[in-house]
Every structure is written in C-alpha cells, then in structure tokens.
Amino acid sequence: MFKCVGMRDVTRTLIRDWNACDLMNKRCIVHYRGRVQGVGFRFTAVRQSKGLSVHGYVKNESDGSVLMDVEGGTADVAELLRRIEMEMSGNIDSINLDERQPQNRDGGLVIRY
C-alpha cells in the first residue's frame, strides 16, 4: 500500500515501481481524501478515463472520501492517475493506493452509487 500526501507522489512511485512498457494489467484501489465530494470528482475521473483502456468504478464513501477501483494496462492506469492529479490536485489532501490482483473486467470506468 502506498500512503502519500499528494497525487504527484503516487504517480512518481507508480512510474518508478511499474515498468511503463509492461503489458500486464494492473489493478488499484485508490481512496482520495480531501474536498473530493460535491465537486464533480467522480465525473472528472470518468471523463479523464476516455481514450484509455481502463475499467472499474468510482464512488463516494460515507466517510467523505472517494474510492476508485481501476484496472488496465500499466501505462493507462498511470496516465489516468496523472490526469486526475492535473485536474483535481487542489481538492486532494491525501490518497491511499493499494495494488490488487486484476479481475479482467471490461465496460470502462463508471460511477457507482
């Protein structure tokens, strides 16, 4: 599990630890904390996933955080995290990222209620 105080730390860690040319699927459970509910965070995540081969869901949690369960190729998952960082960094106070076994899902990234 990675515990970071900002997306830049997570993105750098992923790029360092994952081979960006690795064609294997990666799956991450990401908890975003901060001012992440009521600001379009989930919709931004889905919009930023367009054009990437990533699958999973993003949803609000009862504790005020947002959970994203995403999987796809290494480069696409890292790119999605980077895109979210670029647009939402002012809202993110901290994140927890836990790498999991891929489930080979399809259907893109969707909002789960």
Tell where the protein language model's regions lie, with residue ranges:
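Intrinsically disordered, low-complexity, mixed-charge
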Residues: 2-113
